[in-house]
Structure formats: C-alpha cells, structure tokens
A protein has these predicted regions:
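Transmembrane alpha-helices of multi-pass small-molecule transport proteins
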Residues: 6, 30-79, 104-111, 129, ...
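Specific transmembrane alpha-helical segments of multi-pass solute transporters/efflux pumps
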Residues: 17, 21-22, 50-100, 136, ...
Length: 303
C-alpha cells in the first residue's frame, strides 16, 4: 500500500473509532458514575500512552515547566474527559459529536481572543456560523432553557471549550516536548492526578464494577484502548506525514458515524433541527479549514 494511502487509512480508522465512542461512553455512564468512569479511563489510558510514547518526549520538563504541564493536563485531559462523560450521561451521541466538532472553531476563537492570531473575514463568518449551529441545537430560537438535552449539551460544550483552550495554550510546549511527547506527558500527569479517585472507586464500588454486564465492560475497554490509546497514536502518526489541515478535515466524519450508529440502535432521531444545526456547524468548520489553507498557500507554506 502506498504511504499516503496508509496515512489516509489511519485517519479514516481514527474517525471511525472515535465516532463510535460517543455511544460506548453513553453505555458506560448509564451504569457507572461519569466522574469515576472518567478517572478510570484517564488513569489506565494515561499510563499506557506514557509507557508507549515516553521515548517521543523531546525534552522532559524542568522547574516551572511542570506547572504548565499540570495546567495543560487539567484542561486537555481532566476537565475535557470529566465534562464529556457527564454530558454524555444527559445527551445523545449525535448531539455530543456535533458539539465536539466545534473544537476547531473554538480554538480559532481563543487564539484570536488571546492575541495569538487575527481573524480574517472568512474566519469571523466561520465563528458566526458555528455559534448559530450551537444555538439551534440548544433551541435558543424558542427562547427557553428547558430543552431535553440542554444540560448534557452544555456539559459537552464545556469539554470542547476546555480542549480548544488546551490546543491554544499548548503551542510552546509542543515545540519544547514534541506533539506526541507532550501528549504522553499530559496523559501521564493526568493519570497520576486521577489515580486516587480511580483506586477509591475500584475499592468502594467493587461490587458495581464486578457486576457490570459484559456489553458495558466491552464498551469500557473499547473506549480506553481503541478510542483513546489507538486514536491518539494514529493521529500523531498521520500528523507526522501530512499537513495538519488535512488531518483536521477528517473530523467531518465523526457526526456522520456517531449519528448513524446512534440512530441505528434507537438512541437518536434524525430531526430537521439536528440537520440545520449540523449544516451550520460543519459550514463553520469548513470555512475555518479553507481560510487556513488559503493563508498557507499565500505564505508559500504547505497547506
């Protein structure tokens, strides 16, 4: 197989694996407290990723750099995973996938707000479109805050926002430690932080964990191994071989995979509101990606 086909195959596999994890996460948090589940997922996946990719760390942190690693771990892993799990307990896989797909647009918003970038007109339009998509999904047009999935959607939005802020604040750390190296560091630090809660949950609720149905255990194992360890590793494999703009475009597949799977098992219903929200949100992401691609061509850099 040609090298480029292997890369694109890896990216397709990443989106398939990650697209399914909205459903598997929901299956788990229906039986396990979402915060305890997030702690268990982080602890196990963090140790595995650190062991697998410790040699990718270009330079280990020293002194105050550990504080930055701790902050990035809190934003990019702990807050992200905890609020995602809490949100998926209260919303649907289709809603969750659509909101998490706003990460590229939220990243742009933070980069502009913090002075790292200046938004072009196309990027400003992208922010407006994505915001409109979120408001439609949250039923803001009805001027009420009582939607069936409002709380869950908002919790997932906090997760997406936290991860977007992590992406913006991690740029210097990526240069210091390497992309996969930083991931190993923040996952390892997060595993240490969440280990006490994981141990307490495993001991205090041993009966609950041991009596989980087989399908829940399989969903939990899938989420930890395939939707965390494998996807992180494949994503960085691809980032080392094709431009990041091409990697980002594959995120479009997540809502399609998550929604179709969720509808197939009866956990979602395809509505006009969901379609309109998807069109607006994905339109915003498309404008963001195209604007970065245009800037790269104009600067003579690879897209």
């Amino acid at each position: 197989m040609a090298p480029l086909l292997r890369v694109y195959g890896a990216l397709l596999l990443v989106q398939l694996l990650f697209g399914l994890h909205y459903l598997t996460t929901q299956l788990v948090v229906e039986r396990i407290n979402p915060v305890e589940w997030a702690a268990m997922r982080i602890s196990i996946a963090g140790v595995i990723l650190l062991l697998l990719h410790r040699h990718s760390i270009m330079r280990w942190p020293v002194g105050a750099e550990w504080r930055q690693v701790a902050l990035l771990a809190a934003l990019g892993v702990v807050v992200n995973a905890v609020f995602f799990a809490m949100g998926m307990e209260r919303t649907t896989p289709a809603h969750g996938a659509l909101i998490m797909c706003m990460v590229p647009v939220l990243t742009l918003a933070f980069a502009v707000a913090l002075g790292y970038e200046r938004a072009s007109r196309a990027q400003q339009a992208a922010l407006v479109l994505a915001l409109a998509g979120a408001l439609v999904l949250l039923e803001a047009d009805r001027f009420r805050l009582t939607g069936a999935y409002l709380i869950g959607d908002f919790l997932v939005f906090i997760s997406a926002t936290s991860f977007a802020l992590f992406l913006v604040l991690s740029r210097q750390a990526v240069d210091r430690h390497g992309a996969m190296g930083l991931t190993a560091l923040v996952m390892g630090a997060s595993a240490v932080a969440m280990a006490p809660l994981s141990l307490w949950s495993g001991i205090a609720h041993a009966d609950t964990w041991s009596s989980l149905p087989q399908y829940v255990l399989l969903a939990a194992a899938y989420t930890i191994i395939f939707a965390t360890v494998v996807t992180y590793s494949l994503n960085y494999y691809a980032l080392g071989r094709v431009p990041s703009s091409q990697v980002a475009l594959f995120i479009y597949l997540q809502p399609l995979i998550a929604t179709s799977t969720s509808i197939a098992v009866g956990r979602d219903v395809l509505t006009l509101r969901l379609l309109v929200s998807a069109a607006l949100t994905l339109g915003g992401i498309a404008l963001t990606a195209l604007s970065y691609r245009s800037e790269s061509k104009g600067n003579g850099n690879p897209p």
